Amino acid sequence: MERLIDKMFKKNNKNMSENYFKFSKENMSKVNQTLKKYPLSQKSSAVMPLLDIAMRQSGGWIPDSAMHEIASIINVPYIRVYEVASFYSMFNLQPIGKYFIQVCTTTPCWLRGSDSLVNICKKHLTIDNNETSQDGLFTLKTVECLGACVNAPMVQINDNYYEDLTDISLLKIIENLKKGVDNKVGSQLKNRKGGEALNVK
């Protein structure tokens, strides 16, 4: 009978990279610069920024071998790195699409229609939550607060925020991404900059 502990830490086939992960020369320089920000006795605190560097190098996800490499660099057991990577939703342990769509579904966004935004994504990308489209372009994920409540509802696509969304504006963004056309980042309202109050008369 398989032990529970074995089930918990069994590697997923998609994350069993046979290739040994090594930071590129450029990224190793970033790793070293990051480590300088921490006392030698506290370099394990650099786990999150190092995971981010590894994820960007790997195309948006963190292979198992990258977590082993980070554990070696900061001198902690592998499981300590895995605990952090698996706890935070911003870290992906599976490959993702070219465009990673994260729809905020916390209360402010939900009250402003985030459920409808999720449905728009599912319908027009023909994927469900935590799935990637067959063409490899899009991955959809519902997430908790992304910190832009004043501009609800909003989504994050890769590193960009798209705020004050409607079904129509989100659909336009998706269609532009399919065509390789740039989108306006930030508030999708014509006369709103950042989180300034709306002038409602």
Question: Where are the language model's segments positioned?
Answer:
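Signature of N-terminal electron-transfer/Fe-S-associated modules in redox systems
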Residues: 2-201
